[in-house]
């Protein structure tokens, strides 16, 4: 792995996560604005608990740590989307740095130290797919950096770690016990011994985490629970327990009992930290009903019946959950599938007994497999299954890909590069349509369009470079990260000052209420909250339903204008003026990206014309006499 290429990839990854962080359209969880609303209302209430919300039966949807984080960040950063999302990015980079450290500290990953530890040299595939034996030329730190970059290249990391409704904190806190355990193993090895060898003192206590670390890590696990849910103590503690067990060549029953006692104590401490919510909240009954019952217990119920849902072929079945890690990888899904195929081939390889495979397995690989197994098995049990639930184990997937990087067949990387190429072409088309060039919509300037097209060309070159046998792997990684940067560049004009509503002057708008009430569209739970980051300061967004449940057309607009000081109204791209004129006047206009498309709205025959389904105009309107 060329170090210069790694540095370029690291710069692309950092740029992808930082650039456009405050954007309205970055990949995120659809419920992000719901949680931003709860955080804002709680901050406005002047107290930390109970949580506050104007949304019906939507208050204690998550433990308070996520909202407290937003309250602190909002106070420091002026309640901007950038401020709310920045802590998640810090957590993400911390996980990536810790992962790089773990892999680099573990071993050089060369020859028999790599992979399954069966004494086989690394295998690199040539362009035709045949393998030739080659000792890995990766330095430990290069392999560690590679693991971090692969983790950042997963789409689940970009989407669910970067947004305010983030998975980054629990990923960090639930990974910490595993990382600290391997640090403790490294501290106990001799100067010349392998990093994972057990110290000469093989007493029960030497084979288990130290008591101080158990207490501190138990408190850390509690912080992770306070971000997401008490139920996650099951996979977090079980993964820690199994990783410690799998990292040792042998553990007697005394050590096993002591390990179970220590992990159990840490779990109790973590649950105690989470339980402080019930102690500190003035409304513990509301916490129980809204969070424990409504948010958690319902995941074990299903109207179709548990087994009917579990064995079905839809997205919530056991079969789909088995592909959760590949789904979370996004554009790198083919590489994850290639890793899985290689693992299955080794498991069923003839003439090697299972016990031999297990005892010869390197502790680093055993760590990752135990980590992945626990999270996957745990989240096949609830009736509501989703690839999102195993996101805290994605660092283990990145670890395995980095370890087996030279051995995964080159064709899997080429498939990822091909997906990145398709994504770059589509994004380039969107950038072209947005631009002033060739009669586009004029949303972006020529300079912004040229920048996006140049980045798309760079991604295309990187993807095509994957055809070279020695460059296919790094080219795939660069092309995937390049797509993320390209996405930021394409979205940049949608978040510029020119794309936002300007405050109307007194000659065009005389507010009737204080603060003036603005009716804004709400096509999903809590989405109207985003207009607090779009409208000028001092205007109060009031949601109205859009879609099948709402009044449509001119009559619906007139009703809204009669009931509010002003209205934000969305119309098709080809509409040059609002349909309420001359009974209304325009306070502002901007372009928006449409989401939650209806069935049949996006088709193969119109995929190349995004102006037909991706864009809309939003008009800020008031009554003509206002």
Where are these regions (language model features)?
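Transmembrane-helix motifs of polytopic, lipid-linked glycan transferases
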Residues: 86-115, 119-126, 176
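Membrane-interface transmembrane helices that cradle and orient dolichyl/undecaprenyl
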Residues: 112-113, 118-138, 177-214, 224, ...
């Amino acid at each position: 792995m060329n170090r210069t290429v790694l540095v370029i990839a690291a710069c692309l990854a950092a740029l992808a996560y930082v650039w456009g962080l405050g954007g309205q359209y970055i990949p995120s969880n659809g419920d992000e604005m719901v949680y931003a609303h709860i955080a804002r209302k709680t901050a406005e209430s002047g107290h930390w608990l109970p949580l506050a919300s104007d949304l019906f039966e939507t208050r204690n949807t998550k433990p308070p740590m996520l909202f407290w984080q937003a309250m602190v960040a909002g106070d420091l950063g002026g309640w901007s989307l950038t401020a709310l999302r920045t802590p998640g990015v810090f957590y993400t980079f911390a996980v990536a740095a810790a992962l790089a450290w773990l892999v680099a500290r573990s071993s050089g990953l060369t020859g028999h130290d790599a992979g399954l530890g069966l004494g086989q040299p690394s295998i690199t595939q040539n362009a035709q797919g045949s393998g030739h034996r080659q000792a890995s030329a990766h330095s430990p730190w290069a392999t560690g950096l590679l693991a971090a970059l692969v983790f950042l290249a997963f789409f689940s990391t970009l989407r669910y770690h970067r947004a305010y409704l983030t998975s980054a904190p629990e990923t960090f806190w639930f990974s910490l016990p595993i990382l600290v355990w391997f640090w403790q193993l490294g501290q106990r090895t001799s100067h010349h011994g392998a990093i994972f060898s057990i110290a000469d003192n093989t007493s029960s206590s030497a084979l288990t985490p130290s008591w101080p670390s158990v207490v501190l890590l138990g408190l850390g696990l509690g912080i992770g629970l306070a971000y997401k849910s008490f139920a996650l103590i099951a996979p977090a503690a079980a993964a820690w327990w199994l990783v410690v067990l799998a990292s040792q060549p042998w553990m007697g029953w005394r050590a096993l009992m002591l390990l179970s006692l220590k992990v159990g104590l840490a779990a109790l401490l973590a649950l105690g930290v989470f339980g402080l919510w019930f102690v500190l909240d003035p409304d513990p009954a509301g916490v129980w009903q809204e969070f424990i019952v409504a948010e958690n217990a319902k995941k074990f119920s299903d109207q179709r019946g548990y087994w009917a849902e579990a064995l079905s072929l839809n997205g919530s079945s056991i079969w789909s959950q088995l592909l959760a890690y590949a789904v979370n990888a996004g554009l790198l899904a083919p590489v994850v599938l290639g890793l899985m195929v290689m693992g299955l081939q080794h498991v069923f390889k003839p003439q090697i007994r299972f016990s031999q495979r297990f005892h010869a397995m390197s502790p680093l690989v055993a760590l990752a497999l135990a980590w992945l197994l626990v999270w996957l098995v745990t989240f096949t049990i609830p009736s509501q299954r989703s690839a999102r639930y195993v996101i805290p184990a994605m660092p283990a997937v990145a670890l395995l890909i980095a370890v087996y990087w030279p051995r995964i067949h080159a064709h899997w990387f080429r498939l990822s590069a091909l997906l990145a190429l398709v994504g770059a072409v589509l994004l380039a088309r969107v950038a072209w349509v947005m631009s002033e060039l060739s009669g586009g919509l004029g949303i972006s300037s020529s300079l912004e369009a040229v920048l996006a097209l140049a980045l798309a060309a760079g991604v295309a070159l990187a993807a095509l470079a994957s055809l070279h046998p020695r460059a296919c792997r790094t080219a795939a990684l660069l092309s995937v990260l390049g797509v993320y940067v390209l996405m930021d560049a394409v979205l940049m004009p949608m978040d510029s000052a020119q794309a936002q509503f300007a405050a109307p002057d007194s000659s065009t708008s005389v507010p009737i209420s204080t603060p003036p009430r603005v009716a804004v569209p709400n096509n999903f739970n809590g989405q109207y909250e985003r207009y607090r980051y779009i409208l000028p300061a001092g205007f109060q967004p009031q949601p109205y339903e859009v879609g099948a449940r709402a009044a449509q057309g001119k009559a619906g607009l007139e009703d809204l204008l009669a009931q509010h000081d002003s209205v934000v109204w969305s119309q098709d791209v080809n509409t040059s003026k609002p349909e309420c004129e001359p009974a209304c006047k325009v306070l502002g206009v901007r372009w928006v990206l449409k989401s939650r498309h209806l069935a049949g709205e996006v088709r193969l025959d119109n995929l190349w014309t995004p102006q037909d389904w991706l864009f809309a105009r939003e008009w800020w309107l008031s009554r003509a006499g206002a």
